[in-house]
UniProtKB/Swiss-Prot annotation:
The lineage of its organism: Eukaryota, Metazoa, Chordata, Craniata, Vertebrata. The 26S proteasome consists of a 20S proteasome core and two 19S regulatory subunits. The 20S proteasome core is a barrel-shaped complex made of 28 subunits that are arranged in four stacked rings. The two outer rings are each formed by seven alpha subunits, and the two inner rings are formed by seven beta subunits. The proteolytic activity is exerted by three beta-subunits PSMB5, PSMB6 and PSMB7. It comes from the Eukaryota. It is found in: Cytoplasm; Nucleus. The modification Phosphotyrosine is found at residues 6, 24, 76, 121. The gene is Psma2. This is Proteasome subunit alpha type-2.
Length: 234
């Protein structure tokens, strides 16, 4: 009850030391569609569930796995409109870096800058925190990277992680399956199997999205490729 009086104030700490609006933003993430990221020896895979709103909905009109640069991509769990704002901001930050330094932005630099934007929205008046967590993958300096950034602006590097609905089950599954020598092909299968742990209904190429990042860059798998991977694990 003591927290309730602070729940509408973004910039005021509650007596227990919480910013309650951030707690609510994290709840929005935990209720969002599951997403998985796995760093392999030779690349990174991102996978997510794409909920179909209606049989009349064109499921390929909006993507959840998005490229930021040729070598960086991301996915989210949480609120789609907030995600699109951050995708636009991330692309702009990457372009600004390139204009100044004449080289692609390193993955860790982009993560730091996007997380700073998210953190700014936890201490400014007239705004609210972003209701999304991001998984950001990239390839630079000859190696893969995987980061997670939360509504608070906190970010961490991961070997493999899951977020969104039933993320605890996803992380438990990954802890059992992950090893340091995992190849990208195996990581794709593992990512899809992790999603399957909490998937409701039939998994098809229309209701999941997969992105991969390796030495060749970042790309979203085509529906045909996803269908082939689903057939391989069936």
């Amino acid at each position: 009850m003591a927290e309730r009086g602070y729940s509408f104030s973004l910039t005021t700490f509650s007596p227990s030391g919480k910013l309650v609006q951030i707690e609510y933003a994290l709840a929005a993430v935990a209720g969002g569609a599951p997403s998985v990221g796995i760093k392999a020896a030779n690349g990174v895979v991102l996978a997510t569930e794409k909920k179909q709103k209606s049989i009349l909905y064109d499921e390929r009109s909006v993507h959840k796995v998005e490229p930021i640069t040729k070598h960086i991509g991301l996915v989210y769990s949480g609120m789609g409109p907030d995600y699109r704002v951050l995708v636009h901001r991330a692309r702009k930050l990457a372009q600004q870096y390139y204009l100044v330094y004449q080289e692609p932005i390193p993955t860790a630099q982009l993560v730091q800058r996007v997380a700073s934007v998210m953190q700014e929205y936890t201490q400014s008046g007239g705004v609210r925190p972003f209701g999304v967590s991001l998984l950001i993958c990239g390839w630079n300096e000859g190696r893969p990277y995987l980061f997670q950034s939360d509504p608070s602006g906190a970010y961490f590097a991961w070997k493999a992680t899951a977020m969104g609905k039933n993320y605890v089950n996803g992380k438990t599954f990954l802890e059992k399956r992950y090893n340091e020598d995992l190849e990208l092909e195996d990581a794709i299968h593992t990512a899809i199997l992790t999603l399957k742990e909490s998937f409701e209904g039939q998994m098809t190429e229309d209701n999941i999205e997969v992105g991969i990042c390796n030495e060749a860059g970042f790309r979203r798998l085509t529906p045909t490729e996803v269908r082939d991977y689903l057939a391989a694990i069936a």
